[in-house]
């Protein structure tokens, strides 16, 4: 989108926003976002991670544990695997003469599922299952309906008079008995058929 100024015949190009890189403090080129939410130019963050890796390598050459580079803003871990590229319209192609590699493709998630985790080697697998939150809510509703938790049952009847409150509580009690009967009938049908 081009915006023309009538006074001095200059053209301003709107590239989709005035977002600044947190390193060079200029408008972002080849923008990438860290998982902590900070926006950087790809060449700037690449130079930052490369420079911090080299300086850390020189200082810790005898120390075998290597820490990943840190975000310049909040000091959380940053690597090429944790950078998410932002694509927009009208972006220029990267210059072929620069020594900065192309932007990363973004984080890759393991599609094996939440319930699996790999240990040290491929042969060690630990399986764990997380309970389904929907099932927990359903179980809690059935429990409250069947066994009538008194603390939760009194809240809806606070603003009623005594007679209508008693009728509503009796209706709810008979409804819970009907639910209990239907639940028992359903289990009996499952076991018998």
UniProtKB/Swiss-Prot annotation:
One of its GO terms (cellular component) is endoplasmic reticulum. It is a single-pass type IV membrane protein. Barely detected in roots and limited to the root tips. Expressed in leaf hydathodes and in siliques. Coiled coil: none annotated. The chain crosses the membrane at residues 175-192. Pfam families: zf-RING_UBOX. GO terms for biological process: protein ubiquitination; ubiquitin-dependent protein catabolic process. One of its GO terms (molecular function) is ubiquitin protein ligase activity. Disruption phenotype: No visible phenotype and no effect on drought stress response, probably due to the redundancy with RMA1 and RMA3. Pathway: Protein modification; protein ubiquitination. SUPFAM superfamilies: RING/U-box. Keywords: Endoplasmic reticulum, Membrane, Metal-binding, Transferase, Transmembrane, Transmembrane helix, Ubl conjugation pathway, Zinc, Zinc-finger. Its EC number is 2.3.2.27. Its main location: endoplasmic reticulum. It is found in: Endoplasmic reticulum membrane. A zinc finger (RING-type) spans 21-75. PROSITE patterns: ZF_RING_1, ZF_RING_2. It catalyses: S-ubiquitinyl-[E2 ubiquitin-conjugating enzyme]-L-cysteine + [acceptor protein]-L-lysine = [E2 ubiquitin-conjugating enzyme]-L-cysteine + N(6)-ubiquitinyl-[acceptor protein]-L-lysine. It is an enzyme of class 2 (transferase). InterPro entries: RNF5/RNF185-like, Znf-RING_euk, Znf_RING, Znf_RING/FYVE/PHD, Znf_RING_CS. The RING-type zinc finger domain is required for E3 ligase activity. E3 ubiquitin-protein ligase that promotes the ubiquitination and proteasomal degradation of the auxin-binding protein ERABP1. Interacts with ERABP1. This is E3 ubiquitin-protein ligase RMA2. The lineage of its organism: Eukaryota, Viridiplantae, Streptophyta, Embryophyta, Tracheophyta. The gene is RMA2.
């Amino acid at each position: 989108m081009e915006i023309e100024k009538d006074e001095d015949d200059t053209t301003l190009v709107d590239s989709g926003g005035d977002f600044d890189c947190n390193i060079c403090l200029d408008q972002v080129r080849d923008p990438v976002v860290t998982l902590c939410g900070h926006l950087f130019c790809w060449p700037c963050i690449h130079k930052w991670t490369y420079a911090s890796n080299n300086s850390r390598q020189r200082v810790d050459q005898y120390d075998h544990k290597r820490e990943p580079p840190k975000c310049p803003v909040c000091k959380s871990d940053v690597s090429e695997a944790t950078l998410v590229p932002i694509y927009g319209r009208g972006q220029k192609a990267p210059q072929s003469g620069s020594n900065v590699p192309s932007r990363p493709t973004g984080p890759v998630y393991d599609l094996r599922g939440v319930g699996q985790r790999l240990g040290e080697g491929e042969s060690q697998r630990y399986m764990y299952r997380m309970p389904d939150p929907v099932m927990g809510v359903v179980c809690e509703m059935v429990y409250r309906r069947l066994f009538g938790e008194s603390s939760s049952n009194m809240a809806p009847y606070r603003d009623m008079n005594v007679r209508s409150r008693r009728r509503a509580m009796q209706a709810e009690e008979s409804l819970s008995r009907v639910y209990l009967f239907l639940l028992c009938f359903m289990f009996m049908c499952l076991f018998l058929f």
